[in-house]
Regions:
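Active-site flanking residues adjacent to catalytic metal/cofactor-binding acidic residues
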Residues: 59, 86-87, 189
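Long, well-ordered, tryptophan-enriched scaffold segments
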Residues: 90-220
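Cofactor-binding active-site loop characterized by glycine-rich and histidine/acidic residues
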Residues: 1-2, 6-78
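A glycine-rich helix N-cap at a beta->alpha junction
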Residues: 78-89
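Conserved small/polar residues in nucleotide/adenosyl-binding loops
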Residues: 3-7, 218-224
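Residue-level preference for the first positions of well-ordered beta-strands
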Residues: 53-55, 81, 186-188
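Predominant activation on well-ordered alpha-helical scaffold segments within soluble catalytic domains
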Residues: 35-42, 72-73, 83, 151, ...
């Protein structure tokens, strides 16, 4: 089949192409465009008054492209629901410091956290002077996040941030996506993955195994590059 000769003459492209599949909504050559493309789908959804989630995936390498930041800025200003997955598999964009960020990440990436947050906020607003208490808590939380939580760059742009999350932990990812769907506005899920995870030859040499066609597991041969 064409899939078996992907990235070779006569085979399927390594990138989305509309003439190859009706599931490919647009033509592209690199994922620096993914957030912008997702925003287009988000805008179409909102104009049609439909309700579903749009998810764009972008790698840490693609995030170096200026188009990605233009789209992030636009995503913040639109103030509509949009999920962005940052696949961090090469470098740590925002390293954890000690165990506190890991603990806080686990807490704020759970449904129970958002249930408690909503209940406490609603209760405080009913009390005399409750609105001032809520604002004081928000300021304290913001200052604390600037000190110990990763992803502050995205938060400063007005985009909610969840993570870092182990991208190979499916159960954890499902929980985090459930939380992301409850957040109003754009949200980034920062997943940390290991390139070639689960296949030792690819783990040892991730660069050589990037974007290649199918290879034999028993007689491993890689295509040569002229």
């Amino acid at each position: 089949s064409e899939m078996c000769i992907r990235d070779r003459f006569g085979g399927m492209s390594g990138f989305p192409k509309r003439n190859e599949s009706h599931f490919d909504a647009f033509d592209t050559g690199h994922s620096s465009t993914s957030i912008s493309a997702g925003l287009g789908l988000v805008k179409a959804r909102d104009l049609k008054n439909e309700h579903y989630s749009v998810v764009s995936v972008i790698g840490d390498g693609a995030l170096t492209g200026g188009m990605a930041y233009e789209a992030l800025n636009n995503a913040s200003s639109l103030k509509t629901n949009f999920i962005i997955v940052l696949n961090d598999n090469t470098m740590s964009i925002a390293k954890n410091v000690g165990g506190v960020p890991h603990m806080l990440s686990n807490i704020r990436s759970s449904d129970s956290y958002y249930d408690l947050k909503e209940n406490v906020t609603n209760t405080l607003y009913k009390l005399p002077g409750g609105d001032h208490i809520v604002e004081r808590i928000k300021k304290t939380k913001s200052n604390l996040k600037q000190i110990i939580l990763p992803g502050q760059m995205f938060e400063c742009m007005g985009i909610s941030y969840l993570g870092p999350v182990n991208g190979h932990d499916i159960e954890k990812l499902i929980k985090v996506f459930h939380v992301a769907k409850r957040i109003n506005g754009a949200v980034i899920i920062h997943v940390v993955t290991h390139k070639g995870h689960g296949y030792k030859p690819a783990e040892r040499n991730p660069a050589k195994f990037h974007g290649i066609g199918p290879v034999s597991y028993t007689h491993l041969t890689l295509p040569t590059i002229a």
